[in-house]
C-alpha cells in the first residue's frame, strides 16, 4: 500500500507537466500542428484588381482546400471552387492543390498537384483541368507516369494546355482528347522546355517555354549538354554513408 501511494504521488507531477501548455515539448513541436505556419496563397489577381483568389482550408472536408474570392473594396468572401468539386472520379479525397491557374476566359482552372522536387523546387507533378461550367475534372497527359509533368500552362485563347514531359514538349486540347508531341529528341543530354542543373542553380532558370499571344506558336529553350564534364557533389545527410551525385557542370574554358 505504501509503495502504491508513493508511485501515485510520483506520477501526479508528470501528468500535470504533460498538460501544462506553457511547457514547450518535442511532442508539441514535431508531432502536432500547433506551431504549423499559416500560409497565404497562392493568390491570383482578377481583372482590373476587383478581387483576388486564394486557397483556404475547407469547412466541409477535413483534408480539402477551397479556392475563394475576396472583393478588394468590400472584403466580401465567396467560395468559387469548393473541395467537393476537386474529387476525381473513383477517388474519395480532393486534390491537394500546390498551385493553380485560371484560363484567360475564366472557363477552366488548371491545378498543379502531387508534386516532386527537382533539385531545389517542386516543379514536377500532375496537372488537372477543371471545367468551371460542367465541373468535370480531366487529368492532363493521362498516359504519363505520375508526377512527370512540368510547367503546364493554358494557351492565351484557353483552348489548349502545353507542358514539359520527360524533357519534351506536348500540347493537348482542354478535354484531353488530342495530344500532340512537339519535340521528340528530349532524352539524356538533350533538354527541351526546361533547364539543366547549372542554369537553375546559378541563374534561377527553370520554366523554359512560352505561348505566342495568338496561341499558334510556342518558343522554348533547347539544351544540348553533350561534352560537359561531370562534377560530383557529396550527399552526407540522406543515408548512413555518403552518396555521390553526378552533375554536368561547365568550368571556365570548358564546353558550355
PLM feature segments, named:
Residues 18-256:
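Beta-propeller folds
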Residues 2-12:
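Sec-dependent N-terminal signal peptides
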